[in-house]
């Protein structure tokens, strides 16, 4: 994923728009700012060669990050995430052993880790924070927005292709998730299935959910490469 951290930030592509950049008819030229310096004009082809040669990822707001070495913030997040996983395992272990006190303790610990994990990138936009950087804060939010909108778009595409229509089937969209009903696909595939039969509906929904998730994961590979210039990601 994007290696967002103060020391991995390389500069910013002015006027960057990933969808526009992918348009083959795009004749726009781009400039890159690095501190107070500006690197000339790049065509779409020249910019692509530049990004590949430098091995950098690009956020939706145009900020570039080196990909060859882990940044401080991603390293911290990985450490805290691994600790949360361990706390959750311990909470489950002690719960199964009947030790409620220790189970509750580690459950609280894992929850605190979750709060810290969710807060780190958000606090980048706080002016009193040690690593305050508007570009980095915007890189997180704009790329997240772009990814969730992309998710909605390709999920609708999946539904539209199978149902042969152009409807928007998204029920709700959040900062990190989209909600869809599997019922339209169930009715199309199993017209004689009684949707009130919970057992059969559950099996049908799980099958569809697995298929849609696999489709989305392939889409995320495309998003990472084309929108962010990344070969590896954790968008799944």
What does each model-identified segment do?
Residues 1-236:
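Conserved acidic
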């Amino acid at each position: 994923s994007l290696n967002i951290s103060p020391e991995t930030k390389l500069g910013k592509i002015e006027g960057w728009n990933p969808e526009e950049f992918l348009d083959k008819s795009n004749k726009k030229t781009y400039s890159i700012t690095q501190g107070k310096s500006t690197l000339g004009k790049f065509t779409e082809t020249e910019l692509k060669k530049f990004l590949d040669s430098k091995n950098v990822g690009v956020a939706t707001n145009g900020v570039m990050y080196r990909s060859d070495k882990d940044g401080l913030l991603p390293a911290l997040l990985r450490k805290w995430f691994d600790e949360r996983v361990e706390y959750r395992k311990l909470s489950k272990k002690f719960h199964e052993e009947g030790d409620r006190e220790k189970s509750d303790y580690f459950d609280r610990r894992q929850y605190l880790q979750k709060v810290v994990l969710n807060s780190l990138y958000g606090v980048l936009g706080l002016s009193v924070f040690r690593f305050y950087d508007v570009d980095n804060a915007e890189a997180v939010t704009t790329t997240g927005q772009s990814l969730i909108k992309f998710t909605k778009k390709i999920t609708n595409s999946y539904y539209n292709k199978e149902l042969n229509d152009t409807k928007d089937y998204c029920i709700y969209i959040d900062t990190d998730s989209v909600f869809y009903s599997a019922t339209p696909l169930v009715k199309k595939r199993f017209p004689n299935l009684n949707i009130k039969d919970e057992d059969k509906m559950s099996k049908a929904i799980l099958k569809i959910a697995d298929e849609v998730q696999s489709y989305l994961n392939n889409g995320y590979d495309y998003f990472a490469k084309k929108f962010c210039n990344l070969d590896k990601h954790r968008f799944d």
